């Protein structure tokens, strides 16, 4: 039976950002999962590897989001948002504002793109 190529997308850079404590999403969870995988030898050898995400380029982000939304997200990341941002869901309970949220989002989106490209290229079966 052929072993599957598995890639874990992670960077310590992701741990620099934090959702508000009352939000259920915790960016530290990925670090803890990585520690468990690493302690069990599941991140290297036998078709397994770890790859760091790269920030998604704005031109790629604009294929999925309007320039207006990206600007609102960037502005909110600096602690400023308004009614228009709220209308787009920025600053709500589901998408709370936090310092560096734009940078985190760009890196997380980039990680998704890295994973998709690894799978499409055949360099990974699972990412």
Q: Locations of the language-model features?
A:
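HDAC/HDAC-like amidohydrolase catalytic core signature
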Residues: 1-127
């Amino acid at each position: 039976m052929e072993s599957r190529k598995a890639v874990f997308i992670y960077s310590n850079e992701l741990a620099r950002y934090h959702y508000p404590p009352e939000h259920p999403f915790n960016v530290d969870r990925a670090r803890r999962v990585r520690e468990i995988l690493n302690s069990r030898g599941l991140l290297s050898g036998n078709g397994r590897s770890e790859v760091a995400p790269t920030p998604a380029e704005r031109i790629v982000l604009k294929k999925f989001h309007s320039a207006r939304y990206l600007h609102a997200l960037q502005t909110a990341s600096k602690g400023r948002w308004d009614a228009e941002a709220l209308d787009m869901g920025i600053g709500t309970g589901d998408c709370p504002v936090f310092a560096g949220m734009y940078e985190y989002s760009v890196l997380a989106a980039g990680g998704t793109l890295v994973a998709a490209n690894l799978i499409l290229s055949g360099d990974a079966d699972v990412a």
